[in-house]
Amino acid sequence: MLSRLFRMHGLFVASHPWEVIVGTVTLTICMMSMNMFTGNNKICGWNYECPKFEEDVLSSDIIILTITRCIAILYIYFQFQNLRQLGSKYILGIAGLFTIFSSFVFSTVVIHFLDKELTGLNEALPFFLLLIDLSRASTLAKFALSSNSQDEVRENIARGMAILGPTFTLDALVECLVIGVGTMSGVRQLEIMCCFGCMSVLANYFVFMTFFPACVSLVLELSRESREGRPIWLLSHFARVLEEEENKPNPVTQRVKMIMSLGLVLVHAHSRWIADPSPQNSTADTSKVSLGLDENVSKRIEPSVSLWQFYLSKMISMDIEQVITLSLALLLAVKYIFFEQTETESTLSLKNPITSPVVTQKKVPDDCCRREPMLVRNNQKCDSVEEETGINRERKVEVIKPLVAETDTPNRATFVVGNSSLLDTSSVLVTQEPEIELPREPRPNEECLQILGNAEKGAKFLSDAEIIQLVIAKHIPAYKLETLMETHERGVSIRRQLLSKKLSEPSSLQYLPYRDYNYSLVMGACCENVIGYMPIPVGVAGPLCLDGKEFQVPMATTEGCLVASTNRGCRAIGLGGGASSRVLADGMTRGPVVRLPRACDSAEVKAWLETSEGFAVIKEAFDSTSRFARLRKLHTSIAGRNLYIRFQSRSGDAMGMNMISKGTEKALSKLHEYFPEMQILAVSGNYCTDKKPAAINWIEGRGKSAVCEAVIPAKVVREVLKTTTEAMIEVNINKNLVGSAMAGSIGGYNAHAANIVTAIYIACGQDAAQNVGSSNCITLMEASGPTNEDLYISCTMPSIEIGTVGGGTNLLPQQACLQMLGVQGACKDNPGENARQLARIVCGTVMAGELSLMAALAAGHLVKSHMIHNRSKINLQDLQGACTKKTA
């Protein structure tokens, strides 16, 4: 129950950061102004002489107070160093500084508002600083920084508040009760310090629950564009959030704290209300005397300066101990900001992260990516490590050492993500991480858990064997390895080691690469339980002359002859003057199924949806879910009591499935308000239809509907395609039209459209499974020209499901392929134009592939070309583990 309340509170604070910050500041100013000139008018040193306060201070007291202040400043300094573990000393340092400053101001305002004595503030300031604990702020920031988007930032802050809120509340209560015992001591200085301490704890609690999460949410929101549109917190060293179960408090400790709180409440009640024998008036008089406020002791004087000048002079005038304290604070601040770990600051500067190759420690080197010895700082030799076979052998002492980027890399197999032309290979990147010696044998799980939960240490202080040990013991979920490790790559490496032990052939993963890949773009977006990446050859076909422009089309495939054949088709189209294309329709669909009590009720709902009034109501609800989604059409069908509704809407440059699904849910909720007896069976009732052959996609269309045409001169048909127009038309009729009809095909009136569609989809980060519907195509050929010797060809594709934002298009290699075509990302001037342009390119490339394959079939070259170009010449018996070798 409490966790749910704190979660709701955290979500509200993170979702409205400006309102919370402005409200907190306004409340502070209001409390200060309400009491500044309307409270107690007796101000010692300005309009009253207070002899009680003119006491001689021993030199030993001054020394002790100065030492205490310096310790408090050093404590705060080390707290800020802990915040550096999150990666950015500026973002979190400012947030921590705001927390400290706001807590101090709020404490001062509260005490002033309650008319308390402030003469003990000088002595109590170190006590206040020592009460500040930024560990919880650091933990909450970790939750926020493990996010991939601003929406996830809010959710993670809410989740962090749900976990940390109850614990922090109980701790604040216990601290107040413990410190509050000092207010009953009868010693004036101790009472003032303890009173101030209680106020500080409450102020820290207030700021942590309101100001700090709002500030973190706002800072991350403002910095979301600092890395070319990608959130700055996507860096690997920002994603070190701990497992939720590890953050949850120990129930035994919580029960002890609650029992302690109850006991302290009884102590306070007995001391203040039951055991106090003094009359009320006597108590009041005594308190006045003890605080130096007695009328007979204080003497009124005429102020010589105004009140603000009096306060300003008090702030400016400093003793020698205050000078020492201020000097130490300034020295540490300058050291922290300008001279400490400049390398860390440079790696987090607002430059393109792609231009700086990430140098990380390779835990278990793979032969497939790095075959040369690795260089180590100080000319230290790397220990030879065994291959990733999953077989446990006696481990030597592991040493995590910083690497140097090699400048001489002959015969080096690497995988570079991003714009390699921007890389400066002559620069030497050296991390300043100290060497960490790890034990020979894995330590106990309890010790490993403590190290993992330590903000100053973390997973990098644990060996791979210890991490594997924690995973096997269920202390770390295997699916969260990337999140918990200091780098995503190490998490993938450990998962591979875990998997290798379970495989019949432990060396199976040897040639599946995993290094030098930006997994931060994969996590939470593209794939789970990652064990590497699949390098697929990418060829280029072109130039494709389409609508007066030339395109070099990337195609990822392992089928020989496909790119070459498509390239020949592009050449033929170019020699014929190019192709023309149009987008006929644009609308992604989602087809939910609902059920009503009777078939007649379903008919009534269907009739209502087909009215202009019903459509307007549903459209308003649907369109409210997105600034791009605009409902264009409803197609309904009935099967008994079931009603199938096909929502069709534009989705901008996104493929649009998630966007349309969100709008569909909202529209169904609105429909349920009008027909309460309606039951929603599924948001997808296969009436869309997605990733399945369906006549409705072929007839009604889905995604982008495109058509492309070209005229190929007879000379080009003879010299480039090596056939005749009559032969190609004859094959097209009997193969693509009659043959497909005999097979009962739906949308398969083509030679091999799926080949080209899938190759482009894989290269450009599309959903490869959607080639089922996207490959719907009819290829038509006719004789044209004055002598009917030229070839007219057209391809019509009614359901190209494609997008240029979201999903796999966020990965850098896929973005590179989209940039080749000039359609990467969203079109700012005309939303959706990039996706439509990509659909036209797909249709034009399909036509090029159709042209070349049909020519090969007409000329009888298909089998011959595949025998030459599509058969491996490697002797499989020479390969280790080949089936032919084993059976021989």
From Swiss-Prot:
PROSITE patterns (UniProt xref): HMG_COA_REDUCTASE_1, HMG_COA_REDUCTASE_2, HMG_COA_REDUCTASE_3, HMG_COA_REDUCTASE_4, SSD
CDD domains for the chain: HMG-CoA_reductase_classI
Domain (SSD) ranges: 61-218
InterPro entries xrefs: HMG_CoA_Rdtase, HMG_CoA_Rdtase_cat_sf, HMG_CoA_Rdtase_CS, HMG_CoA_Rdtase_eu_arc, HMG_CoA_Rdtase_metazoan, HMG_CoA_Rdtase_N, HMG_CoA_Rdtase_NAD(P)-bd_sf, HMG_CoA_Rdtase_sub-bd_dom_sf
Enzyme class of the recorded protein, top EC level: oxidoreductase
Description of activity control: Regulated by a negative feedback mechanism through sterols and non-sterol metabolites derived from mevalonate. Phosphorylation at Ser-872 down-regulates the catalytic activity.
Ranges facing Cytoplasmic side: 1-9, 79-89, 150-159, 221-248, 340-888
Protein name: 3-hydroxy-3-methylglutaryl-coenzyme A reductase
Lineage, opening ranks: Eukaryota, Metazoa, Chordata, Craniata, Vertebrata
Gene: HMGCR
